[in-house]
């Protein structure tokens, strides 16, 4: 006997992917996340491909995972997907000493990234 399956937290037309413990500050990651928020997934992938930010490759990989989850797990149409949510959370902060006995310490922040894609109806279609 196991626990009952938890109810799904997303709507039926949504899929999600999460990247945890990314070695980048939340502020820098949020710059890239806000760049794709609200866009169609094809446009978002193109923007991430040509972005010069270091973390853009990891964000692209997470977005591709969300698209694959939508297609394979939830049977959503890939061409009708938009990036509904892309938000960043704080993770751990790795601390170390400065070299040569300096008095302060270096803090290396980590982040979490969550991307939710949503299937939307095309505007040209009649219901």
Swiss-Prot record:
Matching InterPro entries: Ribosomal_uL22, Ribosomal_uL22_bac/chlpt-type, Ribosomal_uL22_bac/org-type, Ribosomal_uL22_sf
GO terms under biological process: translation
Recorded superkingdom: Bacteria
Statement: the UniProt record of this protein carries the keyword Ribonucleoprotein: yes
SUPFAM superfamilies the UniProt entry points to: Ribosomal protein L22
Pfam families: Ribosomal_L22
Single annotated GO MF: structural constituent of ribosome
Keywords annotated in UniProt: Ribonucleoprotein, Ribosomal protein, RNA-binding, rRNA-binding
GO CC annotations on file: cytosolic large ribosomal subunit
Function: This protein binds specifically to 23S rRNA; its binding is stimulated by other ribosomal proteins, e.g. L4, L17, and L20. It is important during the early stages of 50S assembly. It makes multiple contacts with different domains of the 23S rRNA in the assembled 50S subunit and ribosome. The globular domain of the protein is located near the polypeptide exit tunnel on the outside of the subunit, while an extended beta-hairpin is found that lines the wall of the exit tunnel in the center of the 70S ribosome.
Complex formation: Part of the 50S ribosomal subunit.
Family statement: Belongs to the universal ribosomal protein uL22 family.
Protein name: Large ribosomal subunit protein uL22
